[in-house]
Amino acid sequence: PHGYTPKLRKAIFEWFNLHLKGDTSPVTDDVTDVVEPEENLLVFEGNLPENDRMKTIQEWFIPMATPEPPTTPSDAMTWRDDVLSSLKGITFQDTFPEQLPRLCEVRTAGGTKSGQRGETWVFETADAIELRAHLVLNPGPRTPSPLVVCAQSPDQKRICYPSLSVAEGTDALIVDVRGTGATAMGVGMHDTARRLYMNIGQSLPERQVHDLLAATRLIQHHRTYAPVAVYGRGAMAPHAVYAALLDETIEEVIIEAPPLTHQDPNTAEFLAVLQTGDLKHNAAALVPRPITVVGALPAEWEFLTQVYQAAGCGDRLRTVDSLSAWTPCEWQ
């Protein structure tokens, strides 16, 4: 327990006495002046064992996948299917929302002189979390309009109405996934939530991917968009990648400054994801769907390029200088 009380301490001591000593007498004092000698508390006589591997246990106890890039189009598609099967069977067993979330209300958030309008969609997820998704409507000639969806970053400060710098004629959906917006948590509660979700075979980022998908499905049910693209910047780039992998109606992915590896403690944690592959490997399973990189693709992500080239889709890996420069890729 994180907090002790005299009543709790006495109960603990009585349990120890009963089961370790066979002593049934009641404990009357929860504090003692007895100090155990340090030599009685030392483990391994105060010296760590030679060749201690505990500090690297995460690297070898459960072997990590080390995939080799496929070399032919057919091999690339087979490899992709294997990756998707593994991710859905291990890491994302219950992530995709099979049922539409319950729509609570749609609030009009006003507009601008240029014709831009905003709506806030309040919805409830399958596990009864009430969230908000902010739809920014940008007038344009294209019908139906493209839609760019993103998960709100926990680092984003609360503002009156979120927005996304997309091109004219492209609508944007910013989803306040759990832990952001109205459900933002302080550092202590955030860490507690991370631990609790793992107790039930989930993780906070995995639940955020669920929220992102739920909002996307909700909007698609009520509005018509083509194409639907998902965007992730920095720490939220993995959310975009995995949301698209789980939902084939998301036709394009846009990433900016993605993390280099899931082994970085600052990268979103997804249970057992490294048994399938690292982020750069799993992102390559998006083939043949287009991926647009804002800025430059990190050199460490060369595996992604190799897979797309092997599949004959190298032209579907694009780069743009800014998100506002993104336009749909004509690939189908």
Give short role names for the model-derived ranges.
Residues P1-P146, P154-D171, R178-A226, E248-E252, ...:
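Alpha/beta-hydrolase-fold serine-hydrolase catalytic core, especially in secreted/extracellular enzymes
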Residues A151-Q152, V175, Y231-R233, E256:
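Short His-Asn-centered micro-motif
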Residues A229-A240:
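Gly/Ala-rich beta-loop-alpha elbow adjacent to hydrolase catalytic centers
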Residues A243-A244:
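Aromatic pocket-lining residues of Rossmann-like dinucleotide-binding sites
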